[in-house]
């Protein structure tokens, strides 16, 4: 609850029309990022599930809606990195930093799944499916594993931590529909990594 209070009291403000600042600096930041607003939505859902206190759900929806309204690329349902203030009115969103990273879409995917679980509203599940499909298309690639003698879609090279956070969204979706479409590729990626890159002396990859 202390962390949550800090996020809401100091992370969210009306710069860029809302959203959560992404880090602390000696000088005040102005941009709003997917990597901070998305996790706040997820945390709000989890705090609501733990406490049933409406404030958490209200903020989770507020953060999620901001992500869709300001930071989402509507053409593929994935999320841009951040938005900077409008030059004429800093309380409006301005220029977007349009790089896309896997974790920036994985957190709103997880939030959409959690909001569906909480509210039962189909729009959240529909959005979760759209995000998941685009994540799979962008951050997985066809691969032939000699070690496994299998062809599958492997997690593409990139930042392992980013991909781990993306996978949380796939796991949350799987907990709803039990469809192994994405889980199978994640599992095979991990088994391939273990089979091909495990250090025998310490079992680290």
Give residue spans per PLM region.
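Acidic/His metal-coordination segments adjacent to aromatic residues that form catalytic metal sites
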Residues: 22-26, 82-96, 139-152
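Extended ligand-binding groove/face enriched in aromatic
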Residues: 1-47, 57-58
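Ligand/cofactor pocket segment of small-molecule handling proteins
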Residues: 42, 67-102
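Structural helix-adjacent loops and short alpha-helical linkers that scaffold large soluble proteins
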Residues: 1, 47-62, 74-75, 113-129, ...
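CBM-like carbohydrate-recognition segments
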Residues: 10, 32, 130, 134-205
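Well-ordered alpha-helical segments within folded domains of soluble proteins
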Residues: 1, 32-48, 97-117, 157-174
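Amphipathic alpha-helical segments of tetratricopeptide repeats
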Residues: 8-9, 49, 65-69, 117, ...
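Oxyanion-binding "anion nests"
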Residues: 101-119, 124-140
